[in-house]
Amino acid sequence: MTMDHFSEYKAIQNKINAALETYFTADCPQKELLDAMRYSLLAGGKRIRPLLLVKFCEISGGDRAAALPAACGIEMLHTYSLIHDDLPCMDNDDLRRGKPTCHKMFGETNAVLAGDALQSAAYCAVLSAPTASERTAAMAKTLAFAAAEQGMCGGQYLDTSKEGLPVDRKSVV
């Protein structure tokens, strides 16, 4: 990666982080839930998935700013998967990105709810993108497929149900 590419990566990463900061800021009775969502969503990370979306949008002639809602949606979906993956009933991790996991900070119930809420919020973010309705629908469908039984949930199932057993390439792919 050249210095120009790195500078561009950092600039896009900063835009994505700034956009993510605007979500879940309301003062409401569910403040602890929002805190759990923001804690995990804003805990750092490379933002590779949203960065790729922004770059693909630009390469295909789209506008970087118009891609940010969908980019945030992808990061929300990714964060939901990490929260759930860390739960005691899954991988039972205590740390994520060098910090206590969501369930360690906010309890298991709030972590499950934070993950569920981030998954739903991901679709809201994608569907709020200022693009043609067909394109927005296609993005939401792609996101849903990525999360469903053939995507992340299916992968998590294989991870938990086959733990300690040999897994062949065909069943994973």
Give the positions of each predicted feature:
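Mg2+-dependent prenyl diphosphate-binding active-site environment of isoprenoid biosynthetic enzymes
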Residues: N14, E21-F24, C28-V173
